[in-house]
Curated annotation (Swiss-Prot):
Entry keyword Oxidoreductase: yes
GO molecular function, one term: metal ion binding
Catalytic activity from the UniProt record: chlorophyllide a + oxidized 2[4Fe-4S]-[ferredoxin] + 2 ADP + 2 phosphate = protochlorophyllide a + reduced 2[4Fe-4S]-[ferredoxin] + 2 ATP + 2 H2O
SS bond partners: none
NCBIfam families listed in its UniProt record: DPOR_bchN (TIGR01279), PRK02842.1 (NF002768)
Keyword field contains Nucleotide-binding: yes
Binding of [4Fe-4S] cluster, residues: C22, C47, C107
Protein name per the record: Light-independent protochlorophyllide reductase subunit N
Entry's family note: Belongs to the BchN/ChlN family.
Cofactor note: Binds 1 [4Fe-4S] cluster per heterodimer. The cluster is bound at the heterodimer interface by residues from both subunits.
Length: 460
C-alpha cells in the first residue's frame, strides 16, 4: 500500500482504461449554450442510443442536434461520405438554418479514418454555413474533454478584429480615404479610455446565470470581461488579439488553453478554478494581480459564504471521501471538501495536465497544510480493479464515482455519489458552494436516516 505524504502531493500513473461517460455527451450542454448552433454527431447506433438516453429529449421536441448514423456501406467505403454529409447538412440548413454546424467525430470515424477536416471546408463553401469539426471520441478523450475539443476548434473562428470598428473603418476608407487613418487613431484612443485594463477572455461553458455572477465579481474589482468562449450566439464569438489575457473556469480545458497560447498567441492566467469560496477568491485574486489591482471586499465575501454553510460543515467534518475519477473536476472538488474539514486519502483522475492545473495543485497543497491533514495520493488513469481493493482497505465514508461502480459499492455497504451530478450542477462562484455540500451530504444523511429506522442490516 502506498504511503500518503504529509507535506507534498504524490502523483502516480496506472494503466487503467477510462471509466467515464463518452465525451460526445458534451452535446448535452453545448447545444443549449450556443443557441444558434446545430450539432451533428457522426457515429453508430450505440452513439445514438447513448445520446437519446442520457439527454432525455424526445424527438418531437426537435432538439438542435442529430445523429448521422454510419452503416456498413460507410465503413466499407461504398458510400461517398461527402455526398451523404452534404445531403444531411442541406436538410439541416433548410429545416433549422443554424449559424454554425458542428461535426462531432466519434470512435468509429477515428477507426475508419473519415476525413471530416477535409470534407468540412468544401461543404462549408458549398452550403454557405460555417462547419466546425471536433473529434470527441472516447478512444482519446474522457467525459468532459468533449467540450474541450469543441472549444479548441472554435478558437480559430474567433475574429482578430472588432466587427464594429472594422465596419466603420471600411466605410470611412471607401467614402473618405484621407480620413481613414484619423478615424482609426480616434477609435483606438476611445477604446483605450473605455477599457482601463487589457482585454480578458474567459473560456469554459457555464450557464448564463453563472457567467453573470463571475462577471459581476470581477466588475467589483474594476475588471471588465471582453468576452466569453463559448458565447450565446456563434456570430458573437469574442475578438481575440495577440497578447490578450485568457483564463479558464473549468479544469478540463487544457487543449483549449494550449490552442489559445500557441495559435492565437494569448497569455494564459494560471489560476485556481472558481469552485467553492476558497477557489473563487483565489481565482479573483490571481486575475487582479495580473492587472496590478488590489482586490477589495474578498475577506467579507468569503466569510459570509462560510457562515452560510454552518449547517453542513458538522456533517462532513472528519469524514473521509474517495474520488474514483470521472469528470476531471476531482482536484477542485477535493480541495474544497478538504477546506470543509473532510479527509481525502486518494484522488483518481482520468487525465491530469499539470501545467494547466498548476495553480489548482498548489492551492490543494496549501489547503492540506492549512487544515493540517495528510495530502491525498493522486493517481492518473487508475486501474479499476486495484482502485476497488484500495477502497476496501480505506473504507471511506463516501466514494464519489461514476455510475458504473455505484451500485456494486453500495452493495458492499459503502456510500456513493455519482460524479456526473457535479458536472451538471452549478458549482462555480461564491454563492453555489451550498450546492456542492448538498450533493455530498445527501448520501451521508440518507445512511443516517436508515440507521435511525433500525435498518442497519441494509447498510452494514
Amino acid at each position: 500500500m502506498n504511503q500518503i505524504n504529509n507535506s507534498t502531493l504524490t502523483f502516480q500513473c496506472e494503466t487503467g482504461n477510462y471509466h467515464t461517460f463518452c465525451p460526445i455527451s458534451c452535446v448535452a450542454w453545448l447545444y443549449q449554450k450556443i443557441e444558434d448552433s446545430f450539432f451533428l454527431v457522426i457515429g453508430t447506433k450505440t452513439c445514438g442510443y447513448f445520446l437519446q438516453n442520457s439527454m432525455g429529449v424526445m424527438i418531437f421536441a426537435e432538439p438542435r442536434y442529430a445523429m448521422a448514423e454510419l452503416e456498413e456501406g460507410d465503413i466499407s467505403a461504398q458510400i461517398n461520405d461527402y455526398e451523404e454529409l452534404k445531403r444531411l447538412c442541406t436538410q439541416i440548413k433548410n429545416d433549422r438554418n443554424p449559424s454554425v454546424i458542428v461535426f462531432i467525430g466519434t470512435c468509429t470515424t477515428e477507426i475508419i479514418k473519415m476525413d471530416l477536416e477535409g470534407i468540412a471546408p468544401k461543404l462549408e463553401a458549398e452550403i454557405g454555413i460555417p462547419i466546425v469539426v471536433a473529434r470527441a471520441n472516447g478512444l482519446d478523450y474522457t467525459f468532459t474533454q468533449g467540450e474541450d475539443t469543441v472549444l479548441a476548434s472554435l478558437i480559430q473562428r474567433c475574429p482578430s478584429k472588432d466587427r464594429e470598428t472594422e465596419k466603420i473603418n471600411k466605410n470611412n476608407s471607401s467614402l473618405f480615404p484621407s480620413l481613414s487613418i484619423f478615424s482609426k487613431n480616434k477609435n483606438e484612443s476611445n477604446l483605450s479610455q473605455d477599457k482601463p485594463n487589457l482585454p480578458l477572455v474567459l473560456f469554459g461553458s457555464l450557464p448564463n446565470s453563472l457567467t453573470n455572477q463571475l462577471e459581476h465579481e470581477l466588475e467589483k474589482q474594476n475588471i471588465k470581461i471582453s468576452g466569453w468562449l463559448p458565447t450565446k450566439n456563434y456570430k458573437e464569438l469574442p475578438v481575440i488579439h495577440e497578447g490578450d489575457y485568457v483564463c479558464g473556469v473549468n479544469p478540463y480545458l487544457a487543449r483549449t488553453a494550449t490552442n489559445l497560447i500557441r495559435r492565437r498567441k494569448c497569455k494564459l492566467i494560471s489560476a485556481p478554478f472558481p469552485i467553492g469560496p476558497d477557489g473563487t477568491r483565489a481565482w479573483i485574486e490571481k486575475i487582479c494581480s495580473i492587472f496590478n489591482i488590489e482586490p477589495t471586499g474578498l475577506d467579507e465575501r468569503e466569510k459570509a459564504v462560510w457562515d452560510s454553510l454552518e449547517n453542513y460543515l458538522p456533517l462532513v467534518k472528519g469524514k473521509s471521501v474517495f474520488f474514483m475519477g470521472d469528470n476531471l473536476l476531482e482536484l477542485s472538488i477535493a480541495r474544497f471538501l478538504i477546506r470543509c474539514g473532510m479527509i481525502v486519502p486518494e484522488i483518481g483522475i482520468p487525465y491530469l495536465h499539470k501545467r494547466y492545473q498548476e495553480a489548482e495543485i498548489k492551492l490543494l497543497e496549501d489547503t492540506c497544510r492549512k487544515m493540517q491533514v495528510p495530502t491525498p495520493l493522486i493517481i492518473e488513469k487508475p486501474d479499476n480493479y486495484e482502485e476497488l481493493k484500495r477502497i476496501e482497505q480505506y473504507r471511506p465514508d463516501l466514494v464519489i464515482t461514476g455510475m458504473a461502480n455505484a451500485n456494486p459499492l453500495e452493495a458492499r455497504g459503502i456510500n456513493t455519489k455519482w460524479s456526473v451530478e457535479f458536472t451538471f450542477a452549478q458549482i462555480h462562484g461564491f454563492s453555489n458552494a451550498r450546492d456542492i455540500l448538498e450533493l455530498v451530504t445527501r448520501s451521508l444523511r440518507r445512511k443516517n436516516y436508515i440507521q435511525q429506522l433500525g435498518w442497519k442490516e441494509l447498510v452494514e
